[in-house]
């Protein structure tokens, strides 16, 4: 503003000393100065509004740790590629953030620890928010809902969760299914496997009486294994979220912003519908 005032005073002095022919030149100088200051001010404002670049494990990439044996959320194709709800959601988030998605496949427990210890940026593997997990990592807004289901042989006498008392229960190691079952039925009755498929194979072989796992993969496993069924009564209901290292608010805020956009424009629902048929 001081520059503009000085220029106006200068213009007034020039008008008093010169003929009318000097007026156009003075107006041009004044207009140029105002435009210059406005552009400078706009540049400063834009710089202040621009978000800081995200710091990730690998520059330019969003590294996701997962356990790719959890269909339809994460799985491996015949060609060795990763696909599934979580994979597609993570890819859409990465695109929103201007990053390239990198998927690291490992055991479920290791996937959680990778995000917790900053070895990966995020963990997505049908991860449920629990009080214990909140102590060691932060979570995004919910992006999907899950149900813990019980798989049994078609001729089983197990009709509900109440009938699991004293039975051998197969679960996936480190999952909420494992946590819930050990809390409800004791560790001696719960057998943890590296993935859901191995637990279902144990059920087929008569090594366990039932398997407790998320409903979406449960449906996939039952469809692929004639002679098994899912009980009508759900064991537990829960929400899935994206885990990040404790205190990484910059990344968490960016992820939540991307999720909000994906929900608003219908992308998130389209991804879910791609893998899970609406009933």
Regions found by a protein language model. Give the residues of each.
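Bacterial lipoprotein signal-peptidase II cleavage site
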Residues: 17-34
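Acidic, polar ligand-binding/catalytic clefts
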Residues: 91, 95, 100-163, 229, ...
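Periplasmic-binding protein-like
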Residues: 68, 144-152, 215, 219-260, ...
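Extracytoplasmic small-molecule ligand-binding "clamshell" domains
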Residues: 49-126
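Short helix-initiation/N-cap motifs at beta->coil->alpha
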Residues: 87-88, 102-114, 156, 173-176, ...
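Ligand-binding clefts/hinges and TM-proximal coupling segments of bilobed small-molecule sensing domains
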Residues: 49-54, 176-193, 226-234, 259-279
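A ligand-binding cleft/hinge motif common to bilobed small-molecule-binding domains
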Residues: 127-135, 180-182, 204, 209-237
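Extended ligand-binding regions for polar small-molecule ligands
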Residues: 87-96, 155, 168, 173-175, ...
């Amino acid at each position: 503003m001081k520059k503009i005032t000085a220029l106006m005073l200068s213009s007034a002095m020039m008008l008093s000393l010169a003929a009318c022919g000097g007026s156009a030149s003075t107006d041009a100088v004044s207009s140029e100065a105002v435009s210059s200051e406005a552009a400078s001010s706009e540049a400063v404002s834009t710089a202040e509004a621009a978000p800081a670049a995200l710091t990730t494990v690998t520059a330019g990439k969003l590294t996701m740790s997962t356990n790719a044996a959890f269909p339809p959320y994460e799985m491996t194709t015949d060609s060795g590629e990763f696909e599934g709800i979580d994979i597609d959601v993570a890819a859409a988030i990465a695109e929103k953030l201007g990053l390239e998605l990198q998927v690291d496949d490992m055991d479920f427990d290791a996937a959680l620890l990778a995000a917790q210890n900053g070895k990966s940026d995020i963990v997505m593997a049908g991860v449920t928010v629990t009080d214990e997990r909140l102590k060691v990592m932060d979570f995004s807004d919910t992006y999907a809902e899950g149900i813990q289901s019980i798989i049994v042989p078609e001729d089983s006498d197990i009709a509900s969760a109440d009938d699991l008392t004293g039975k051998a229960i197969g679960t996936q190691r480190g999952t909420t299914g494992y946590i819930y079952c050990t809390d409800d039925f004791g560790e001696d009755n719960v057998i943890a496997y590296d993935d859901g498929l191995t637990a279902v194979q144990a059920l087929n072989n008569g090594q366990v009486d039932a398997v407790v796992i998320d409903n979406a993969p449960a449906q996939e496993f039952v469809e692929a294994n004639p002679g098994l069924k899912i009980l009508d009564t759900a064991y537990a209901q829960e929400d899935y979220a994206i885990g990040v290292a404790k205190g990484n608010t910059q990344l968490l805020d960016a992820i939540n912003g991307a999720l909000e956009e994906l929900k608003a424009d219908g992308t998130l629902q389209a991804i879910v519908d791609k893998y899970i048929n609406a009933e």
